[in-house]
Amino acid sequence: TPPTEGLTIGDKAPTFTICGEKQLIDLKDLRGKYVLLSFWASYDALSRMQNATLNHAVAQADNVEMVSVSFDEYKSIFNETIKKDQISTSNCFVELAGVSSDLYQTYRLKRGFKNFLLDENGVIVAKDVTVSELSSYLN
């Protein structure tokens, strides 16, 4: 039986579409490769640091795509942060509704920001991965 949609390992990750300044991304369009979903905010030091570290690691790998979503409510702060942290902006988005957004609710992020590693079929294979865990999944 195919996995059901949910947020635990082995579940199919809830799909979403998000629009950035230059691009629109639909999670379903990324099937066929590993996807690292990173949820963070500039005011949350741990998630911000993790996002930056993972972003630099993903830039070195060719078999994973990173989708980075910030829940900052001010675009200026978001832009300043990604510049300062040298984040690749290709799949970097800001959800200006912040913690009131549907995406925040869907991924139940109220207990702290998280990241999810999805396999080629959109199934969650790991949560809150570190850089070393990420490279062991991809090798």
Where are these regions (language model features)?
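Short, contiguous acidic/charged loop-to-helix segments that flank catalytic cores in large enzymes
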Residues: 4-5, 24-28, 40-46, 66-73, ...
